[in-house]
């Protein structure tokens, strides 16, 4: 019994450490991003318009970025095989065995992305509704809507994050549904070809953030948080600290920074595999 427990600990120790690290990073990204949009002064006006839905949508987006960065790594089979046979051959068997089980990390990241993507989408639908309902000319610069007449559906489908998000959600559903074991057993080609839609998904993800949806205040020194109650009044006449109206700037897209490294690795891996596939094979000996 003692030997079995010790063997189980030895065999699963590194796997448990990796899983705990993955979970810790996800929790950190979710909580830190949520609190940033909830408490930060530079996002105060955005929070006034959208409330908790902007916190939830941005928190999920950050965790999705992290899982997007990880999901391609197990797919680099040639590079992983080289690492296992060349770099880890002198190490204990646990690291090499862990490399062989990276498929589990790929599946874990995929299902996590599905859950987070649904929450992210629903939160952005609420954001669009609140952009429409809370439109005011007093802080028009913070709003994606240009007038009260723009409907929620129009705000979703007319903006880059909206229509790319819809397409990405459909692609993700196709990729995941065709990945189940029942589909792979009946028609592996369907699984194989639909899985290549991941590249389209990643390309869309790179452009998903170029819609200038989330904005932060840039002049907190001349318009601190306390000035928000004076948005309908003349700034200079009502307060000595509110020297001017709030000004805003759009966030810089971040998703492509998470994806570009793993995507380049995957492209290199596929090029190596393609080169090996077309390379002539010579028979050295026949017995």
Where are these regions (language model features)?
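FNR-like FAD-binding dehydrogenase module
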Residues: 1-287
């Amino acid at each position: 019994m003692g030997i079995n427990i010790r063997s189980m600990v030895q065999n699963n120790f590194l796997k448990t450490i990796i899983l705990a690290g993955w979970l810790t990073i996800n929790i950190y990204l979710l909580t830190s991003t949520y609190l940033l949009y909830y408490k930060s002064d530079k996002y105060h006006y955005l929070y006034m318009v959208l409330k908790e839905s902007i916190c939830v949508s941005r928190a999920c987006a950050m965790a999705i970025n992290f899982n997007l960065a990880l999901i391609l790594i197990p797919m680099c089979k040639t590079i992983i095989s080289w690492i296992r046979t060349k770099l880890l051959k002198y190490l204990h068997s646990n690291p090499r065995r862990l490399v062989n089980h990276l498929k589990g990390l790929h599946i874990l990241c995929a299902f996590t992305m599905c859950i987070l993507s649904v929450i992210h989408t629903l939160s952005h639908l609420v954001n669009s509704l609140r952009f429409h309902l809370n439109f005011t000319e007093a802080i028009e610069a913070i709003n994606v809507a240009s007038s009260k007449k723009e409907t929620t559906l129009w705000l979703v489908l007319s903006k880059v994050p909206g229509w790319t998000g819809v397409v990405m959600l459909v692609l993700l559903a196709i990729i995941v549904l065709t990945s189940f074991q029942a589909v792979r057993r009946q028609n592996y080609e369907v699984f194989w070809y639909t899985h290549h839609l991941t590249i389209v998904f990643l390309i869309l993800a790179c452009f998903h953030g170029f819609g200038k949806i989330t904005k932060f205040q840039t002049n907190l020194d001349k318009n601190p948080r306390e000035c928000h109650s004076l948005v309908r009044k003349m700034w200079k006449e009502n307060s000595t600290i509110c020297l001017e109206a709030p000004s805003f700037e759009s966030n810089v897209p971040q998703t492509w920074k998470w994806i570009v490294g793993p995507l380049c690795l995957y492209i290199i891996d596929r090029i190596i595999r393609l080169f090996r596939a077309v390379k002539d094979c010579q028979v050295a000996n026949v017995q």
